[in-house]
From Swiss-Prot:
Any single GO CC term annotated in Swiss-Prot or TrEMBL for this entry: extracellular region
Domain Peptidase A1: 75-384
Keyword line: Aspartyl protease, Digestion, Disulfide bond, Hydrolase, Phosphoprotein, Protease, Secreted, Signal, Zymogen
Task of the protein: Shows particularly broad specificity; although bonds involving phenylalanine and leucine are preferred, many others are also cleaved to some extent.
Origin species: Sorex unguiculatus
Protein name from the UniProt record: Pepsin A
Family: Belongs to the peptidase A1 family.
EC code: 3.4.23.1
One annotated GO molecular function: aspartic-type endopeptidase activity
Origin superkingdom: Eukaryota
PROSITE patterns linked: ASP_PROTEASE, PEPTIDASE_A1
Enzyme class name: hydrolase
């Protein structure tokens, strides 16, 4: 009888996990390359991954989320907004906090090729007079804020504030595989003081635990998932190791060291890192990354990527991140990205001066290897090897 009760409780707990399936698609970079536009794009758009974090010029009405920095993203999920629901493909981004999608008020070419929200077709939409501006590349996405019901993984998140874009300059966004972005970081970095989607879910009692978790599949187009309100142990092996946040805003933690063959190659004496599902690569200080690129034999090609010989993967050593005393090795098969164009490094350089020293971004290259729990209740991140 006790076993039946226990099984029932387990089934109940499992049922309270709300899962969003993520689909792996061609990245914006791949689409531009296939359409013969990548080289021209790279000549006119400066890739600056650092500009996403700790913006110095952002105001309460401006969010600094450069869309050009999402050009290598491959994982996307579906949400709906309004009554009846209107569907959108979004990036679930733990490196930002706002939700925004294109609207019918946007006549830019980029918007015309994507799903656009029509407030007039939603009986639950509530307008505001607030504007929002999200900077990227050589222009910015401008729009207005409104409230409506957002459905995510079967959760009806009512009275959710979100951005409706009115202008998206930059023809390259015409080819982007996503409509908008759903931010999952803390409210403190949200533009316009907008309540993030997950906070609104928790405040309304729509999830059973104040956490969400992410599994990114390495190979398949399907299989990746974001889970709201719970943890599914079938996605990882061993036990979760918990890492306290060093700062609450981004999902920021302390890294003890980064080594190769037992020798330090970066992060001497420790460094800070943001765990970010909205960054595809693994980013760090320019000088440190240049050292790593040299050690793995990477050199820049005409597509702006650091090319690596595919045949070298089997001979390259692990790069080990030690976090809270636990080692997290990345094999070459993880940090060397393979595509139809060839092989390239999964590392990219960026310099973000912070009061706590050098900053790294643990993007999808890292998260594909380690199931990640984002625990808001205890302000910590849980990591375990993927199953």
């Amino acid at each position: 009888m006790k076993w039946l009760l226990l099984l029932g409780l387990v089934a109940l707990a499992e049922g309270l996990i709300h899962k969003v399936a993520l689909v792996k698609k061609k990245s914006l970079r791949q689409s531009l390359w296939e359409n013969g536009l990548l080289e021209d794009f790279l000549k006119t758009h400066s890739l600056n991954p650092a500009s996403k974090y700790f913006p110095t010029e952002a105001t309460t009405l401006s969010a600094n989320q450069p869309l050009v920095n999402y050009m290598d993203m491959e994982y996307f999920g579906t949400i709906s907004i309004g009554t009846p629901p209107q569907e959108f493909t979004v990036i679930f981004d733990t490196g930002s906090s706002n939700l925004w999608v294109p609207s019918i008020y946007c006549s830019s070419p980029a918007c015309s090729n994507h799903n656009r929200f029509d407030p007039q077709k939603s009986s639950t939409f509530k307008p505001t007079s607030q504007t929002v501006s999200i900077a990227y590349g050589t222009g910015s996405m401008t729009g207005v804020l409104g409230y409506d019901t957002v459905q995510v993984a079967g959760i009806a998140d009512t009275n959710q504030i979100f951005g409706l874009s009115q202008s998206e300059p930059g023809s390259f966004l015409y080819y982007s595989p996503f409509d908008g972005i759903l931010g999952l970081a803390y409210p403190s970095i949200s533009s316009s003081g907008a309540t993030p989607v997950f906070d609104n879910m928790w405040n309304q009692g729509l999830v059973s635990q104040d956490l969400f978790s992410v599994y990114l599949s390495s190979n398949d187009q399907s299989g990746s998932v974001v889970m709201f309100g719970g943890i599914d142990s079938s996605y990882y092996t061993g036990s979760l190791n918990w890492v306290p946040l060093s700062s609450e805003g981004y999902w920021q933690i302390t890294v003890d060291s980064i080594t190769m063959n037992g020798q330090s190659i970066a992060c001497n004496g420790g460094c800070q890192a943001i765990v970010d599902t909205g960054t595809s690569l693994l980013s760090g200080p320019t000088n440190a990354i240049a050292n790593i690129q040299s050690k793995i034999g990477a050199s820049q090609n005409s597509q702006g990527q650091m090319a690596v010989s595919c045949s070298s993967i089997k001979n390259l050593p692990d790069i080990v991140f030690t976090i809270n005393g636990i080692q997290y090795p990345l094999p070459a098969s993880a940090y060397i990205l393979q595509s139809q164009e060839g092989c390239s490094s999964g590392f990219q350089g960026m310099d973000i001066p912070t009061s706590s020293g050098e900053l790294w971004i643990l993007g999808d290259v890292f998260i594909r290897q380690y199931f990640t729990v984002f625990d808001r209740a205890n302000n910590q991140v849980g990591l375990a090897p993927v199953a």
